[in-house]
Amino acid sequence: MDTFLFTSESVNEGHPDKLCDQISDAILDACLEQDPESKVACETCTKTNMVMIFGEITTKANIDYEKIVRDTCRGIGFVSADVGLDADNCKVLVNIEQQSPDIAQGVHGHLTKKPEEIGAGDQGHMFGYATDETPELMPLTHVLATKLGARLTEVRKDGTCPWLRPDGKTQVTVEYKNEGGAMVPLRVHTVLISTQHDETVTNDEIAADLKEHVIKPVVPSQYLDENTIFHLNPSGRFVIGGPHGDAGLTGRKIIIDTYGGWGAHGGGAFSGKDPTKVDRSGAYIVRQAAKSVVAAGLARRCLVQVSYAIGVPEPLSVFVDTYGTGTGKIQDAEILKLIKENFDFRPGMISINLDLKRGGNMRFQKTAAYGHFGREDPDFTWETVKVLKWEKA
């Protein structure tokens, strides 16, 4: 039997790039909560003892940017210089301007356009992907890497592994077979975890705790065997982490945010962007489309692409590929027609249909760590499977 190996990685909420994503989305949440029409493009960068937010925000909301930055850092666990950043004593720099009036006029007519008339906030192309290899209809490599990272955070915050610090990375390699274009996971080949830790713990204790409290609860036992390889803090020491260890920047973990290297990616990041930015809203609607196709049993894998021009509401193109896994109910050309009939790709209508103007409740901040897709949370409206209506031959 021909098999192949495929790998996906994830990073923890305390990774400096992910810290930046969460700050950018915390600011988006605050703006949308007070003013659902807020136009937000908020970037964050960080290094030792410093966080800077910069970008373009037009909103009626009254926002204390510095407080949001400090609260977000503190919530993640950055409470002292020892762990990589001190939320209460670091420098916070704010350089926020208003959205360009040229863009405002072209996209939403300075808020005068009806929802169906709102144009895309920029050009670009986005991809949505789904696969039947997991209940989440997501790639197993990505699901496991992401859940391992989330579990690391859980056992750090609940005191199970008090030696853990916020920064960390995970990576999972799975052996697959290709079954007529569908991906069938056979076993987990390698599990890699590199986690920040305090000075007190030994490498043996780290390995034992990670196996018992992180890997065992996350990786289903049927995928593990005597040949599974475990690399647990293989560099030997990871005390210095967070922004002290590496600089961080919003939008540098776009594959972790999506499908772990499966499917395709148009290159646009999500965090800190309001729903007129099709990098985000377009990617969300095509995930819902691809997921709905697989959930309907029309294909075992599905990739959907959409593309836009700035200021133009209708998409320039919609593409679908089922990798030859169509179940024979209808062909790809008909699936494409079905997608166009069942999903409205105009940005203003995506915002309404997926309720993307609603902030608060950490709505978007939650998306900024451990993946935007495959999550069971009512706030992730794009994960709702839409029942597709079509004429059965």
UniProtKB/Swiss-Prot annotation:
Cellular-component GO terms for this entry: cytoplasm
One Pfam entry name: S-AdoMet_synt_N
Catalytic activity: L-methionine + ATP + H2O = S-adenosyl-L-methionine + phosphate + diphosphate
Enzyme Commission designation: 2.5.1.6
Enzyme class name: transferase
Binding site for Mg(2+): E9
Location in or out of the cell: Cytoplasm
UniProt-annotated binding residues for ATP: H15, D167, G168, K169, S235, G236, R237, F238, D246, R252, K253, A269, K273, K277
Keyword flag rRNA-binding: no
InterPro entries in UniProt: ADOMET_SYNTHASE_CS, S-AdoMet_synt_C, S-AdoMet_synt_central, S-AdoMet_synt_N, S-AdoMet_synthetase, S-AdoMet_synthetase_sfam
Entry note: cofactor: Binds 2 divalent ions per subunit. The metal ions interact primarily with the substrate. Can utilize magnesium, manganese or cobalt (in vitro). Binds 1 potassium ion per subunit. The potassium ion interacts primarily with the substrate.
Residues binding K(+), per UniProt: E43
BP terms from Gene Ontology: one-carbon metabolic process; S-adenosylmethionine biosynthetic process
Key words of the record: ATP-binding, Cobalt, Cytoplasm, Magnesium, Metal-binding, Nucleotide-binding, One-carbon metabolism, Potassium, Transferase
Pathway field: Amino-acid biosynthesis; S-adenosyl-L-methionine biosynthesis; S-adenosyl-L-methionine from L-methionine: step 1/1
GO MF, any single term: methionine adenosyltransferase activity
Binding site for L-methionine: E56, Q99, D246, K277
Cofactor(s) required, per the database record: Mn(2+); Mg(2+); Co(2+); K(+)
UniProt-listed CDD domains: S-AdoMet_synt
Its job: Catalyzes the formation of S-adenosylmethionine from methionine and ATP. The reaction comprises two steps that are both catalyzed by the same enzyme: formation of S-adenosylmethionine (AdoMet) and triphosphate, and subsequent hydrolysis of the triphosphate.
HAMAP family linked: S_AdoMet_synth1
UniProt record similarity statement: Belongs to the AdoMet synthase family.
Quaternary structure note: Homotetramer.
Identification of the protein by name: S-adenosylmethionine synthase 1
Native source organism of the sequence: Picea sitchensis
